Amino acid sequence: MSFVACTLEQKIMYKPTDYEYQQLSFINFNASCGMQLDCENEWFKRANQLPWQAWEVLYAALFPSGIGNVAKPCRMVLGALIIQLRMGFSDRDLVSQVQENPYYQYFIGLETFQHVPPFAPTLLVEWRKRVTMEFVIKANDALCNAMPKLRKPKMRFGSTGTGVLVATQICDATVAPQNIRFPQDTSLLNEARLKLEKIIDWFCRRYGFPKPRTYRKIAHKEYLAFAKSKKPSRVCIRNAIRQQLGYVRRNLQYLDAFMQDGYAPDKKFINSIVTVHILYAQQKYMYENNTHQVEHRIVSISQPYVRPIVRGKASKPTEFGAKLHLSIDERGFARIEHLSFDAYNEGALLQNALEAYRYRNHHYPKRVLVDQIYRTQDNIRFCTKNNIRISGPKLGRPSTDKEANRQSAKTMAKDRADRIEIERYFSIAKRRNGMGLISKKRKDTSLSTIALSVMVTNIFGSFQSAVSEYEEKKSKTTRNR
């Protein structure tokens, strides 16, 4: 069976799925194999609990056109992306696993088990382009609205001994590292030189020019001599940068001369030429001013949107990827407050996060658990004005009342213990749900993958726990009757 992946430029129509149909019972779903499958399987349970209809409404709004090829159903698209992030499959591995696994086929909404792949690996790229970060954030909100509202939940970080939830919001930021080579000035300039040489060769073949003098063999030999040195001195590094800057400048002059004469490059080379121009200007500025800092510094030619994010941690003082500002409410459900590849101060976003909490719940939280970077005077003043207790010590001199100091220390200890929940969330999202290393090559698909990772962590975390508690309480009530 052949598959054709439709590009986003083509007109695609969508037919909303009729969720009134009854999917075959899971016992008979794989009857062709002559065996019965486990109804307690994790994927079967999640398939019957997720808000597919709410997601269907959001997904159908992405298709304004009523003509064209019919797109795949929403449940197949989101289900496949959820499986991929949860299990860590590549695109080809995902298709083969779905083809072999009846549990996965049930999860993505197939009516019966089939031996034919339900979609092609190339379609996953188009799905990730279509399922944008904004769409995933809305789908994540729909997932939160579908969570059962428990009156007396089990003990969580936001609950008290009486089983009553305290309106709580935890805020923190982390970086989702991008899968790029560790950037060095010499390696970036050498990569830029190689790309420019490739483009120059294309110009010469395409328009019949004689090859200009690029000194590529000498440049390659000089770079290898530098790269083989284990601990190059500062003087050696500057000499290597100066040499590579000269070769890059020469190649850029050749390309600029070609284009000024009216010869156009191939479409696939335009972004590389623009990126190398910016990279050369940045590296030249840092070399001439003897500095290592420049605004909007490029650390990857293939992914020029990636920026260095200074974290100040012992293991990773600088990370390269998108910075994620996350908030978790008292039920353990996480939401993305801000997501960007540019560096920013998360402390300035606390008030926006509190206003978003108020918009969703019609009231401010009783307490907000944050680290030291959020405790600015503006944020403390805002929290005091709106009767929000912000974690951390009070400003001013300590009280002379020993009992008050004892209670304050006890409250601070509980706040520190409860704030660990967001660190735990980051750990699960990075180790288990695909946020540990983003391997997508496009900016939009990288952001949507990070947002999907947050939603998947909610599905198999807080949402799963809330549904399990609800079903447990419901079964106890039924038995008592």
Give residue spans per PLM region.
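Charged, often Cys/His-bearing segments associated with DNA-binding zinc-finger transcription factors
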Residues: M1-L50, V57, Q464-R481
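Short, conserved catalytic/metal-binding motifs centered on acidic residues
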Residues: N41, A80, L94, V98, ...
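Active-site- or DNA-interface-adjacent structural scaffold in DNA-acting proteins
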Residues: E111, H115-Q303
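Acidic, metal-coordinating catalytic cores used for nucleic-acid/nucleotide bond scission
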Residues: I67-K72, P102, L369-Q377, R397
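Electropositive, glycine- and tryptophan-enriched low-complexity nucleic-acid-binding patches
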Residues: K313-Y359
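Flexible, glycine/threonine-enriched loop-and-boundary segments that flank and lead into catalytic domains
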Residues: I301-S315
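Helix-centered, glycine/charged polyanion-binding patches within enzymatic domains
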Residues: Q372-K443
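Basic, short loop/linker segments at the boundary and entry of helix-turn-helix/winged-helix-like folds
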Residues: L37-I82
